[in-house]
Amino acid sequence: MEIKSRDKLEPGDVLAKPIYNSNGVALLPAGAVLSESNIDRLRKDYNDISEFFCVDTPGTENIIIEDNIGEEVRIKTSIAIRNKQIREIIEQSKVISHQIINYNIHDVDFYDTRNKSDYVTRHAVNVAIVSCIIAKSMGYSEKELEEITLAGLLHDFARSNQSDSNIEKLYTDRLKCKKEEILPYLTVDLLKDTDFVRTGEISQNVLSSILCHHEHQNGQGYYKVPAEIIKKHKYASILHVADIYDTLSNNDTKSILIDLPENALYLFNRSGGMTPKNIITYFMKDYGAVSESQRLFDPTVVKHFIKCVSIYSKGRRVKLSNGDIAVVNRNFLGHSDRPEVVVIDGTLKGKTINLTENVNYLNLSVIDYVHDEKDYKLKM
């Protein structure tokens, strides 16, 4: 199977997994053969479904795509966030962190199942997963992984709790600041007097990290908190990286609330937009030779993030340096730019090649995801 975006679907494509709406209702089952009318409806009529789908195509039969966290857990957690069910959010934070621990999930490699109607909730789930994986790489305990997962799920709780216009009405005049600056403040305001805080189910570590997750390492974040203070807020620096990573990964750039520095915007505009490769390059530049006055992220967090994140997601179609077209089959920790691929068109068609370990293909590399329409109409 491979992952196709909505605009790349073709009549005759066979769904490898069901298509769900944001409430978990299956619209089409696995095994359904897509027709022109199916595809037209998926493109025009459904705003509450994923932008990406798993389909079976010739040559990809042996590729099995499993998201790090199953769709059932994602949907259940998203519904809890949307309905402001804090008890259920706490329970799902344990489910997610335990899956990451027990299934030895160590890489950030999931195709984005987010859709336009539930951006806020899916963003929260993604930030929680990425934060937990980074923290696991850094050696945090099981209890700490539960806490940081919960912090990720709740970090934008105010956005799911109130409309943007109501947030501005309530707080902009009071704090004299932008909406994106007050969201952490408002989230903590909503949570701090609940029984969950009084009983310790939502800890002070969680609250303080939510409050400071927009702070930069150079002290130039929204609240201008110095780095030495941020370090006292246990998970804030991890949430900061995960939050920006997932926001940049979102195709709907209008949803971005983060004021990116000019050098980041320049990088993305000059190098083809916010592709996974460019996003990782952005973090690597911050991790590299920059002065403390320019650094936005904790370098230790970025080091572990870069080790864990996959540049090329499993199941996505990519172009190789020799011109062949392949589908990513597997990623390797610490070698995210050299995955194992299954070649589906070109001189090496039919071969499965481990670009990390196979010494016969040291000169072969992945250039980028396939974007050209003609490469999606291959003669199989």
Roles of regions detected by a PLM:
Residues 1-94, 107, 253-380:
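Terminal helices and disordered tails flanking the catalytic cores of nucleotide-processing hydrolases
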Residues 12, 18, 22, 30, ...:
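Surface-exposed loop/turn and secondary-structure junction residues enriched for glycine/proline
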Residues 22, 142, 229-230:
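Short hydrophobic/aromatic segments of transmembrane alpha-helices and their interfaces
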Residues 50, 119-130, 144-153, 176-193, ...:
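Hydrophobic transmembrane alpha-helix bundles
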Residues 53-203:
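Acidic/His-rich, divalent-metal-binding segments that scaffold phosphate/diphosphate chemistry
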Residues 150-161, 167, 176-189, 193, ...:
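Alpha-helical scaffolding flanking metal-ion-dependent phosphate/phosphodiester catalytic sites
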